[in-house]
C-alpha cells in the first residue's frame, strides 16, 4: 500500500520474520512507517525499491542498501498494469467489507488498485479506521487472497524541520510566485518553506 494505505500490521510481520525471506524486493512509493525493511541486517532478505525517497529510506538509498526508481505519480497505474513492476504480493489496508462484500482502498487509491489487480496475491489488513472512499477504490473480497483484521490509526506524515537552506530556497521560489497564483506542491520541507 502507498502512503496512508501502508498496512502497518503486515509490514511489521514481514520485518519481524525477515530471515524467512531471500532476495525479496519491496516496491514502495511514499513510506509512512519506520522503514525497518531498510535496516542493514535485512541484506540478502529484504531490499527496498523506493519511488519516493523519504525520511525512513533516504539513508539506505544513499548507502546503496536500497534502490531508487524515479517516476511521475501519474505513471504509477501504468507501471503495475503494463508489467514494468510485476507484483507477486500486494499488501494493502482496506475498509471492512460492505453488505455486498466490497472493501475500499480508502485514502490511497492511485497505483494501489492496479497493483492489486495485477498481483498474484493480495494480502489485506482490514482496518476499521480506514475511511471508505468512493470512485475506483473498490475490490471484492473474492479478489483478496488473505485478510488480517487489525484496527490501527492511519499513518501520518509529520512535518520536517525547515533549515537555513530550505528557508533560502523557499524565499527564492516564493519571490517568483505572483499574487493570485495557484500552487501545486509536493511533500517535504522545501514546499513547506515556499508556503511559509
Language-model features: locations:
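Conserved alpha/beta enzyme-core scaffold
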Residues: 1-196
Amino acid at each position: 500500500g502507498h502512503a496512508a494505505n501502508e498496512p502497518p500490521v503486515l509490514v511489521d510481520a514481514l520485518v519481524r520474520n525477515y530471515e524467512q525471506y531471500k532476495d525479496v524486493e519491496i516496491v514502495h512509493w511514499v513510506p509512512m512507517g519506520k522503514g525497518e525493511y531498510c535496516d542493514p541486517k535485512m541484506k540478502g532478505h529484504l531490499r527496498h525499491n523506493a519511488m519516493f525517497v523519504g525520511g525512513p529510506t533516504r539513508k539506505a538509498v544513499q548507502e546503496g542498501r536500497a534502490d531508487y526508481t524515479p517516476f511521475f505519480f501519474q505513471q504509477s497505474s501504468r507501471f503495475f498494469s503494463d508489467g514494468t513492476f510485476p507484483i507477486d504480493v500486494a499488501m494493502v489496508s482496506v475498509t471492512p467489507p460492505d453488505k455486498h462484500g466490497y472493501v475500499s482502498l480508502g485514502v490511497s487509491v492511485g497505483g494501489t488498485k492496479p497493483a492489486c489487480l495485477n498481483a498474484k496475491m493480495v494480502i489485506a489488513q482490514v482496518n476499521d479506521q480506514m475511511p471508505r472512499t468512493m470512485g475506483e477504490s473498490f475490490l471484492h473480497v473474492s479478489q483478496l487472497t488473505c485478510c488480517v483484521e487489525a484496527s490501527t490509526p492511519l499513518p501520518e506524515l509529520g512535518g520536517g524541520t525547515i533549515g537555513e537552506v530550505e528557508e533560502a530556497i523557499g524565499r527564492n521560489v516564493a519571490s517568483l510566485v505572483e499574487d493570485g497564483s495557484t500552487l501545486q506542491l509536493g511533500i517535504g520541507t522545501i514546499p513547506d518553506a515556499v508556503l511559509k
